[in-house]
Amino acid sequence: MKDKILNALKSKTFFALAINIVIMALIIGVTAFSYDSADDFYNSLYICQYHNYYNNDINYIFATITGSLQYILLNFNCFVLFQILLSCAAFSSVTFVFADKFGKHKAFIFTLVLNILFSFDHYSNILSSKTAALLLTAGFLMALNAIRNKRYSLPFWIGVLEVIFGTFLCFKYFFVGLAFFIAFFIGDMIAKRYE
C-alpha cells in the first residue's frame, strides 16, 4: 500500500495536477472573477438561477448538468465553477503530455510559461469560448499523445472527455481543434519516420 501511494505521488498525473492546482489557487486568491462577455453572464443567469437549459450557445447536456448541480451547491455559481475546474483540467492535461514527452523538469518550466501567459485570463475573466478552445486543444493533445504511445488507457479517455466538454461549451471550435489535431498527427508521423 505504501509503495502504491509513493508511486502515485511520483507519477506524472500527480505532478501535473499538483502544479496546476497550486497555480489556480494562487490566481484565484489574488483576483476577482468577471465575465469577459455579457453572453456568459446571461448564460450563467439562465442556467444557474432560472434553470432554463435551452440555449443557443451552450449544449443542453452541459446546461442540464450545470443547472442540476446548482440545486445541490446553492452558494456557488456552478457555471463559473465548471469553467474554472475545466480550465484547470485542461492545463493539467497539457502539463501531463509535456511531462510524458520531455520529462518533469522541462514540463515544469513549460507549465510556468504557459500559465503566466494564459491562466490568469482563464481564471479571472470567464468566457466559455476560451475554455472550449483550451479544452479542445488539451483533449486532442492528450488523445494524440496516447495514440502516439499506443496507450489507450485513462489519459486517452480524459482527452476524449475534454474534447466532448469543449464541444459542449462551443461547438464551432471543434473543427479548429480537429485541424490542429490532424496537423500535429501528420507532423508527428513525419518526425517518427526520420527518427
Where is each model-derived feature located?
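Start-transfer (signal-anchor) and selected internal transmembrane alpha helices
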Residues: M1-M24
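Extracytoplasmic catalytic/substrate-binding loops of multi-pass membrane glycan-assembly enzymes
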Residues: L26-L45, Y53-T66
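Short hydrophobic/aromatic helix or loop-helix immediately within or flanking a transmembrane segment
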Residues: Y53-N77, L81, L85
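Transmembrane-helix motifs of polytopic, lipid-linked glycan transferases
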Residues: I84-K104, M142
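Aromatic- and kink-enriched transmembrane "portal" helix at the membrane-lumen/periplasm boundary
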Residues: T111-A138, M142, F168
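Membrane-interface transmembrane helices that cradle and orient dolichyl/undecaprenyl
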Residues: G139-F156, I190-R193
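Membrane-interface alpha helices of multi-pass inner-membrane proteins
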Residues: L154-V176, F181-I182
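Perimembrane helix-loop-helix junctions
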Residues: V176-E195
